[in-house]
From Swiss-Prot:
Job description of the protein: Involved in cytoplasm to vacuole transport (Cvt) and autophagic vesicle formation. Autophagy is essential for maintenance of amino acid levels and protein synthesis under nitrogen starvation. Required for selective autophagic degradation of the nucleus (nucleophagy). Also required for mitophagy, which eliminates defective or superfluous mitochondria in order to fulfill cellular energy requirements and prevent excess ROS production.
Listed name of the protein: Autophagy protein 5
Topology in membrane: Peripheral membrane protein
Annotated GO biological process: autophagy of mitochondrion; cellular response to nitrogen starvation; piecemeal microautophagy of the nucleus; protein transport
Lineage: Eukaryota, Fungi, Dikarya, Ascomycota, Saccharomycotina
Length: 294
């Protein structure tokens, strides 16, 4: 199983970051406004902000680290996107809304998005639901650790396992994300995980043709059962809108997942670096409801 996890850990994406002209001084070279970065699927976009600022610092029209009157965030096709989701999860959802798939997800991704294209923008106020990009170097770490506290509680019924980590272990845990140390990550995360979870930390995101994300976090009990995705179809899908399994593909870590997959097996193999299992629902062309409702 660790071989699968390491393949996911080592997975990377090409990210193209375009800088809004409002950041730059007049007369700045056009090429400085576009950065191409190779980014792990299992990290946050905001972890690359020091790199981005450093690349454009000589051309900035202000100091983003001290300007408290401006907010910064990312967009894709003029739609705000959250930095607080793993990069791979964002890619899966953005690829999902770029086309209605008739062939395999993997082939469509190659055609639709050579790069994860994002735009760094700023404004006097934030779009709804978007967490601002802060100058603090610990912003991502604090958010990520909070995610793991939630995961620990969902799995075990308490946060004792993660709160019992020593200071050095907690530093080592986050350090494994930054330095890409897979063995350290597995060592610490295994102390938090459970072979008999009470519930599965699950987040569902749906690609909508409007360009927005629909996010849900169903509570899936694992007490005495190990359901397949088909068994919990009603929890995964928005049954009120008449959506069923024939209308969507289930994507996890860029892979199309069959409905007969056991939920615990899926979680054990494909959970993300923040402890959650992210499932992206992608509309299938010709589905009864997919085109009109999602």
């Amino acid at each position: 199983m660790n071989d699968i996890k390491q393949l996911l850990w080592n997975g990377e994406l090409n990210v193209l970051v375009s800088i809004d002209p409002s950041f730059l001084m007049k007369g700045s070279p056009r090429e400085i406004a576009v950065l191409r970065i190779r980014v792990p699927r299992e990290t946050y976009l905001v972890n690359y902000m020091p790199f981005i600022w450093n690349k454009i610092k000589s051309f900035l029209s202000f100091d983003p680290l001290t300007d408290s009157e401006k907010y910064f965030w990312f967009e894709h096709n003029k739609t705000p996107i959250p930095w607080n989701y793993p990069v791979g999860v964002l890619f899966d959802c953005l690829a999902g809304k770029s086309a209605t798939f008739t062939t395999s997800f993997e082939n469509q991704v190659k055609d639709v998005l050579t790069f994860l294209r994002i735009h760094l923008v700023m404004g006097d106020s934030l779009p709804p639901t978007i967490i601002p990009i802060a100058s603090s170097k610990t912003q991502a770490e604090k958010f990520w650790f909070h995610q793991w506290k939630q995961v620990c509680f969902i799995l075990n019924g308490s946060s004792k396992a993660i709160m019992s980590l020593s200071v050095n272990e907690a530093r080592k845990f986050w350090g494994s994300v930054i330095t890409r140390n897979f063995q350290d990550f597995i060592e610490i995360s295994n102390k938090i995980s459970s072979s008999r979870p009470r519930h599965i930390p699950l987040i569902i995101q749906t690609s909508r043709t409007s360009g927005t994300f629909r996010i849900s976090q169903p509570t899936i009990s694992m007490t005495g059962v190990n359901p397949t995705l088909k068994d919990i179809e009603g929890d995964i899908l928005d049954v009120k809108e008449g959506i069923n399994g024939n209308d969507v593909m289930v994507i996890c870590q860029g892979i199309e997942i069959p409905w007969h997959m056991l939920l615990y097996d899926l979680y054990s193999k494909l959970r993300s670096f923040d402890g959650f299992l992210y499932i992206t629902l992608v509309p299938i062309k010709g589905g009864d409801k997919a085109s009109s409702e999602l």
